[in-house]
UniProtKB/Swiss-Prot annotation:
Source species of the chain: Drosophila melanogaster (Fruit fly)
Similarity comment text for this entry: Belongs to the CWC15 family.
Keyword Plastid attached: no
A cellular component annotation (GO) from this entry: precatalytic spliceosome
Name of the protein in question: Protein CWC15 homolog
Length: 259
């Protein structure tokens, strides 16, 4: 007999398993994303543009100094920026600026030999005779190339014209063929025009596959099987008699079952 329906008088109690010494303590489970990430408070530092710093700054004076440095040139700017740099770095920058200025000055003065060569080339170009005839071979080759180009252009234009004419001819032939097919469809598409044999309409109908001896039907149900089945049956004259003994049904019944 099953004991599944019996009440549990002694239920299972926790605390006897592993890690279940304190029954009052609830189990906890944390995710790595739930752990605190910022455990230190961040403070404002100098140079971040706080309200106290902006209150103590003299923006007018700073603007005037920047304008004065811009008007004075790069020297004042480099000197003002060099105040905040260490002495070694400042000396290196000044030496670099001095070397760059001297090298630029040296580059600005061209060599005497180069100047003489340039002057000689200019003099030779000026002494050249502008009326000196060019090479005959080069002129002949240029004229021949021009003639060849003209011939090629003429041939290309001729080919284009021929292609245009061919396209126009094909389009006209296609239009004529479409018109002929349309007229044939008009003549042979109507069955009322080709039901009589020996006519042009019947010939067109035979050519189109409709047949020249097509018979026109007056109704759609003329060729059904069970149409007018009782047409040949004799007509029965029905008459009404207000007497059950002299009615047709009573007479047939008496003739069939009594006689």
């Amino acid at each position: 007999m099953t004991t599944a329906a019996r009440p549990t008088f002694d239920p299972a109690r926790g605390g006897s398993g592993r890690g279940e010494k304190d029954l009052s303590a609830l189990s906890k489970q944390y995710s790595s994303r739930d752990l605190p990430g910022h455990t230190k408070l961040k403070y404002r530092e100098t140079g971040q543009g706080t309200s106290d710093e902006n209150r103590n700054r003299d923006f007018r004076k700073e603007l005037e100094e920047r304008e004065r440095e811009a008007r004075s040139g790069t020297g004042a700017t480099s000197s003002s920026s060099g105040k905040a740099l260490p002495s070694i770095v400042r000396k290196a920058i000044e030496a670099n600026n001095a070397g760059g200025g001297s090298s630029a000055a040296k580059r600005s003065k061209p060599d005497a030999g180069q100047q003489q060569a340039q002057q000689a080339a200019q003099q030779q170009a000026a002494n050249m005779d502008a009326d000196e005839p060019l090479d005959n071979d080069s002129s002949d080759s240029d004229s021949d190339s021009d003639d060849d180009d003209a011939a090629l252009l003429a041939e290309l234009q001729k080919i284009k014209q021929e292609r245009l004419q061919e396209t126009a001819r094909r389009e006209s032939e296609k239009k004529q063929e479409d018109e002929r097919i349309r007229m044939e469809n008009i003549l042979s598409g109507n069955p009322l025009m080709n039901y009589e044999p020996g006519t042009a309409a019947s010939a067109a109908g035979r050519a189109s596959g409709l047949g020249g001896d097509l018979k026109i039907k007056r109704r759609w149900d003329d060729d059904v099987v069970f149409k007018n089945c009782a047409r040949s049956a004799p007509d029965k004259k029905t008459h009404f008699v207000n007497d059950a003994l002299r009615s047709d049904f009573h007479k047939k019944f008496m003739d069939k079952y009594i006689k």
